[in-house]
């Protein structure tokens, strides 16, 4: 790519204003960072996984404007959650811990000078799910990526010998005990052999037993066995998730957090246990940092309007990448039009790699937020999440990582990642639709105002003013999606039991198997060939519209996505309006890929009716 082709689109206020092209500074011309301590060095001596961004020091031309928002309110941090049979005592409220808040605080009711009359406990009960989850939660640590011994791809998946495939890493996590569910994938796992180098090997799940946990995979479409290659759009649900939802409605259905009756306590237990499961799954420090939302889109909008609406001023900058889903573009465009902030876009190369040097060139003293995907939904590109966070913090910005496509494929630890916000959707990781998670550092969430008002998120309401709870309840106004939050918790426990590293290894092997075979078909152009990818294999076929190819595959029982995948900017960057996008999950097989490849080859040769 010529240097003149590298650019960043700068979006200024106004829906009718066209994007302006802002030249990216040449490499080496960014502010001098040689005297700036790294994020790791700055964090020495502290256990805070979310240190506040530190503005660049030692550079004369860096200006970080003083905050224009009022100081954070000292709000209670956790909503009361009462165990079964206990009625909340409304006559003797415990005193608020910490510093009191003055009468000027806008969150306080008239005439109230401090929070002591409205305090809530600093922690709730230890959640349980009555009669269902008797055992302790899985606590096996997630091994670092690329830290495990390797296995030959021929075993245990019976992959045909292919000269162009390398060995792949398989790092199955240990299966913790204590869970009474009878998971099919744990039955009759094969004995693991040893390689000649005497690396210690670990057990690998039986793919057919895994598939037995997903009832929809027994479906037929057009008389053919269903092959579900549309996993980047949504994943299928294991029977334990379906059963957990049914159990909730049959035995626990109630509103939560308030009431003296048994079912309310059961529902609260289940809901808060799901929050704790989500916390553990992504490595957050506290359950208060987990906010349930409808999905990734709502999570990003929450950050845009609650955090961005408070902190962004005219001329401030938000930096995203060219890889983003529309859900990580449109909210920032709307916010920019309302606040006068400027939206900048980091470019990608022709393979779909994010150009990190050009990304850093966009950062500066006016950068207030970086919002970037960890895995591209359209191309499968895996970005350098930790590097993005480090650079954003170096320039004093908050960082949001879109984990919608990374959460089902990669080990996630937000404490190690260091992002201020991390968002994902439940339906992308074998959970129900309509539920997702916003993770935010506790200090950041505490100083953010609510973005919706209603019940459940308040401590006290008068006709003049309202006093809000702390996170997470402050951001969960009204009756939430209780049942699907419980279902998400069950889905995450299921993935923990399978093993995130097992899943990553198997999916990478599927991608390595499918990629050269698809590329070998005459007329196929692979779209997105980044150095590091997750299990997305977008392509176009010469002489055939993507929708036609999708319909022809459907006739053979194969479900793929055909279109722009809510990522029009990056497809247009590559000269396309649409692609065919097969995407793999850990329940897919090599045999399914063989069927898919044969059908695409027949389409290319004109042997399949695509009308």
Swiss-Prot record:
SUPFAM superfamilies registered for this protein in UniProt: PLP-dependent transferases
Domain of life: Bacteria
A GO CC annotation given for this chain: encapsulin nanocompartment
Residues recorded as bearing N6-(pyridoxal phosphate)lysine in the entry: 428
First and last residue of the signal peptide: none
CDD domains in alphabetical order: SufS_like
GO molecular function, one term: pyridoxal phosphate binding
Compartment annotation: Encapsulin nanocompartment
Keyword Translocase: no
Record-linked InterPro entries: Aminotrans_V_dom, Cys_dSase_SufS, PyrdxlP-dep_Trfase, PyrdxlP-dep_Trfase_major, PyrdxlP-dep_Trfase_small
One Pfam family in the UniProt entry: Aminotran_5
Catalytic-site annotation from UniProt: 566
Region (Cargo-loading domain): 1-208
Enzyme Commission designation: 2.8.1.7
Described function: Cargo protein of a type 2A encapsulin nanocompartment involved in sulfur metabolism. Cysteine desulfurases mobilize the sulfur from L-cysteine to yield L-alanine, an essential step in sulfur metabolism for biosynthesis of a variety of sulfur-containing biomolecules.
Complex and partners: There are 1-2 copies of this protein in each type 2A encapsulin shell.
PANTHER family: CYSTEINE DESULFURASE, CYSTEINE DESULFURASE 1, CHLOROPLASTIC
Record protein name field: Probable cysteine desulfurase 1
Organism: Mycobacterium leprae (strain TN)
């Amino acid at each position: 790519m010529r240097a003149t082709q590298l650019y960043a689109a700068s979006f200024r206020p106004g829906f009718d204003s066209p994007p302006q092209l802002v030249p990216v500074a040449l490499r080496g011309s960014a502010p001098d960072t040689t005297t700036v301590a790294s994020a790791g060095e700055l964090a020495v001596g502290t256990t805070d996984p979310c240190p506040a961004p530190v503005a660049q020091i030692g550079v004369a031309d860096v200006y970080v404007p003083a905050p224009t928002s009022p100081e954070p309110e000292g709000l209670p941090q956790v909503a009361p959650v009462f165990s079964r049979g206990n009625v909340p005592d409304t006559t003797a409220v415990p005193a608020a811990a910490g510093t009191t808040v003055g009468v000027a605080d806008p969150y306080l009711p008239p005439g109230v000078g401090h929070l002591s009359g409205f305090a809530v406990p600093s922690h709730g009960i230890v959640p349980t799910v009555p009669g269902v989850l008797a055992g302790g939660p899985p606590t096996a640590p997630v091994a670092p990526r690329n830290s495990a011994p390797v296995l030959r791809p021929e075993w245990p998946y019976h992959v045909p010998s292919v000269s162009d495939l390398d060995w792949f890493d398989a790092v199955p996590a240990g299966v913790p005990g204590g869970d009474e569910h009878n998971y099919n994938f744990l039955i009759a796992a094969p004995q693991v052999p040893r390689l000649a180098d005497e690396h210690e090997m670990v057990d690998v799940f039986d793919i057919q037993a895994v598939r037995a946990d997903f009832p929809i995979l027994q479906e037929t479409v057009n008389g053919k066995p269903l092959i579900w290659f549309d996993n980047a759009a949504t994943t299928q649900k294991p029977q334990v998730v379906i059963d957990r939802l049914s159990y909730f409605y049959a035995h626990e259905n109630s509103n939560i957090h308030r009431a003296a009756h048994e079912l309310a306590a059961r529902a609260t237990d289940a809901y808060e246990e799901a929050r704790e499961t989500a916390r553990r799954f992504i490595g957050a420090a506290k359950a208060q940092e987990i906010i349930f939302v409808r999905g990734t889109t709502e999570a990003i909008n929450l950050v845009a309007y609650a955090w961005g609406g408070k902190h962004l001023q005219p001329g401030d900058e938000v930096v995203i990448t060219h890889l983003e889903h529309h859900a990580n573009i449109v909210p920032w465009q709307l916010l920019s039009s309302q606040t006068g902030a400027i939206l900048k876009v980091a470019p990608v190369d022709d393979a779909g790699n994010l150009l990190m040097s050009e990304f850093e060139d966009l950062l500066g003293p006016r950068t207030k937020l970086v919002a970037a995907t960890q895995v591209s939904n359209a191309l499968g590109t895996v970005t350098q999440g930790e590097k993005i966070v480090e650079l954003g913090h170096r320039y004093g910005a908050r960082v949001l990582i879109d984990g919608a496509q990374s959460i089902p494929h990669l080990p996630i630890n937000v404490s190690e990642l260091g992002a201020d916000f991390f968002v994902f959707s439940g339906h992308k990781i074998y959970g129900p639709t309509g539920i997702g998670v916003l993770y935010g550092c506790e200090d950041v969430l505490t100083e953010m105002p609510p973005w919706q008002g209603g019940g459940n998120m308040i401590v006290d309401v008068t006709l003049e003013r309202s006093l809000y709870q702390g996170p997470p309840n402050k951001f969960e106004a009204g009756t939430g999606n209780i049942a699907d939050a419980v279902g998400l918790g069950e889905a995450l426990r299921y993935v923990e039991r399978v093993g995130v590293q097992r899943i990553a290894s198997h999916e990478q092997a599927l991608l390595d198997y499918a990629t050269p075979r698809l590329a070998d078909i005459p007329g196929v152009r692979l779209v997105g060939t980044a150095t590091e990818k997750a299990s997305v294999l977008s392509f176009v076929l010469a002489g055939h519209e993507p929708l036609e190819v999708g319909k022809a595959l459907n006739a053979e029982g194969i479900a793929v996505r055909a279109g722009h995948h809510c990522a029009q900017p990056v497809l247009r960057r590559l000269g396309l309006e649409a692609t065919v996008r097969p995407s793999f999950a850990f329940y897919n097989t090599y045999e399914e890929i063989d069927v898919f490849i044969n059908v695409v080859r027949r389409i290319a040769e004109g042997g399949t009716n695509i009308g």
